[in-house]
Amino acid sequence: MSLLFPALTGGPGERVALRFGERSLTYAELGAAAGAVAARVRGAGRVAVWATPELETAVGVVGALLAGVAAVPLNPKSGEGELAHILSDSSPSLVLAAPGARLPAPAAGLVRLDVDARGRGDVPEDRAADTDPALVVYTSGTTGPPKGAVLPRRAVAATLDALADAWRWTADDVLVHGLPLFHVHGLVLGVLGPLRRGGSVRHLGRFGTQGVARELNDGATMLFGVPTMYHRIAEALPEDPGLAKALGRARLLVSGSAALPVHDHERITAATGQRVIERYGMTETLMNTSVRADGEPRAGTVGVPLPGVELRLVEEDGTALAAYDGETVGEIEVRGPNLFTEYLNRPDATAAAFTADGWFRTGDMAVREADGYVRIVGRKATDLIKSGGYKIGAGEIENALLEHPGVREAAVTGEPDADLGERIVAWIVPADPQSPPGVEELAEHVARRLAPHKRPRVVHHLTALPRNDMGKIMKRALSNS
C-alpha cells in the first residue's frame, strides 16, 4: 500500500484517476503502470522526469514516489544552459520520458527510461520514511542559477491534507487545469493532490477557455489556474455566456502562483456569481495560507494560515510584529511540516534561509487584517518600495492602476530618487496603444483611490509585460530594460 496514495490499492480501481485529452487511466491502471516504473527505478537515488503535459509524466512521478526515489521534474522549455546546470547539480541516475519525446543535448546523455502508460506491475509496499525526499524542484534563478529545493514526503502529505481541510477536497471532486507539470502548482497540487484524495484530474494539455467550459459542463468540480488564465477567462466572459454558465457550476475556482488582480476577481464574480479563492505558497514551503471554502472569499487576500502552518510577520531586524491592522507591512516567515529540508548542495543558502529557531524567511511582504486574513503586498526584493519615509507595496498600486479603463496590464517597481529614496514607477500595457494614459492622469487616479504618496512618478508604456511560465511578471527584466 502507498501511504501517499492509498487509493491506488484501497479505493475503487475502476474510477478514473487521470485524463489527458482522450487518454485516461483508472486507479487500477495507474497503480499497474506506476508499479512497473517503480520496479525499474528502485534504488536509483534520484530520477529526472521530462515533464511534458502527458500521462507519462504523472505515471513517472508516481512510480518514482512508489519506489521511494526522489523525482526531479524538468521544464521542457528550459534552455540548454539552465538544463545542464540542473542535471549537473541533481545528478539523476536516469531520465523518465514519454516514448518519442525528443530530449535536448544535456539530457540526451542520461540513461533513458520510456514510461509505458499501459505497463503492468504491482504497487510496492511503502517503506519510505516521511523525511525521505519526494521531489527536488528547482526555483527561479533571479540572482543566480536555480536552486534545487528538496521536498520531503512529509511536506507533500501535510500540504495536500491541509488543503483538503481548507477546500473540503474529497474523492468526489474532479479537478480540471492546464498547468505545467514541472512546478509545485501543476504537479503537487494539480496531479498529486487529486490522487491523494482518490479523486480525478483532467489535464487540458494547453489552457483554453473552451476546454475549461467543456470539462466543467461534463462534471468537473474544481478549476486551478494562474492569474493569466483567469484574466483570459475574465476577458472572454462578456462574449461567452456558455463559459459563464459553466464556471457557475464549479464548486471551487482557485488561483495561485501570483496575485490575481482585484479587477479580474470582480469581473468573474459579476458574470458567474462565483468567487475565485486565492492561496499562497512557494516552492520551498508548498502551501502556507488559503481562503477556505467555507470562509469569506475576500478579493486581494490569500486567506488564513493552513492547519499546521505557523505564520508571523517580522520587521527588518527580525522583530515579530503584533499588528493585525491591515496596514503594517512585514516579511512573512513560516514554520511547519510543509517546509523543504534543504537547497540541494547549497548548505550556506539553506542556513541563510532559516532563522535560528527554524522559521523560513519567505522574502514576501504582507499585512494582516483584524480577522487574520493575509494580504500579500509583494516581494521584499522587488515589490517593497521605500518612498518618502513610507513602506509601500507594489501590489495595491497595481490593482489601482488596473481599475483605470485605459490600462490593460500593469506592474509597479521602484527606482532610486535623490529626494524620496525611491520613486514609484508604473509599467503599463495600455488598452488603446494609440491613446495611452499619461503619468499625470494615472498619478491622479492612484492618489484618489489610495493616497498621494502612492502615486507613480514615472510611467512606461509597453506592448506586453514579461512573464514566466507560471504567469508571474518578471520585474527584474523590467528594471533592467
Question: Residue ranges of each PLM-predicted region?
Answer:
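Conserved pre-ATP/AMP-binding loop-to-beta segment of ANL
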Residues: 14, 121-138, 145, 168-174
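Conserved AMP-binding/adenylate-forming
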Residues: 23, 38-81, 391, 430
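Conserved AMP-binding A3 loop
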Residues: 26-28, 134-158
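AMP-binding/adenylate-forming catalytic core of the ANL superfamily
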Residues: 49, 336, 341-342, 365-454, ...
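Conserved AMP-binding/adenylation subdomain of ANL enzymes
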Residues: 157-174, 182-222, 236-237
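Gly/Ser/Thr-rich phosphate-binding loop
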Residues: 221-225, 235-298, 310
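Conserved beta-loop-beta connector loops within the AMP-binding
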Residues: 312-333, 352, 370-371, 433-439, ...
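AMP-binding/adenylate-forming core of the ANL superfamily
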Residues: 324-340, 359, 365-366
